[in-house]
């Protein structure tokens, strides 16, 4: 089993989207968003190599997996430490170039 760490940047994006979801669509929607995130974290604990490893604009050291419509977890697998590091959450409708720098 792998340990999943969540970066402050990813946590901040998750918090922002959950607040926005609650404001626009209600608390139940925000809770479903957080549940979807937790489900993917559970998958990563058990099967860390899931997700896509080759996207055109994402550096090859990262893998990505979708967890909510338009929201992707960007993560690295550190097999030597049995650890997964969720680095960022991107919205595929927006320019995520700041993550690539």
Where are these predicted regions, by residue range?
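Extended aliphatic helical segments
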Residues: 4, 13, 41, 64, ...
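Basic, Lys/Arg-enriched alpha-helical interface segments
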Residues: 1-58
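Basic/aromatic recognition patch in beta-strand/loop cores that engages polyanionic ligands
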Residues: 47-80
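Enriched for short, Lys/Arg-rich terminal
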Residues: 71-101
């Amino acid at each position: 089993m792998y340990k999943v760490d969540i970066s402050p940047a990813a946590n901040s994006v998750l918090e922002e989207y959950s607040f926005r979801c609650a404001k626009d669509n209600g608390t139940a929607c925000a809770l479903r968003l957080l549940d979807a995130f937790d489900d993917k974290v559970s998958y990563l604990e058990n099967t860390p190599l899931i997700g896509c490893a080759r996207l055109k604009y994402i550096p090859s050291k990262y893998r990505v997996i979708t967890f909510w419509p338009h929201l992707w977890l960007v993560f690295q697998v550190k097999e030597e430490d049995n650890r997964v590091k969720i680095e960022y959450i991107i919205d595929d409708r927006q320019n995520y170039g700041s993550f690539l720098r």
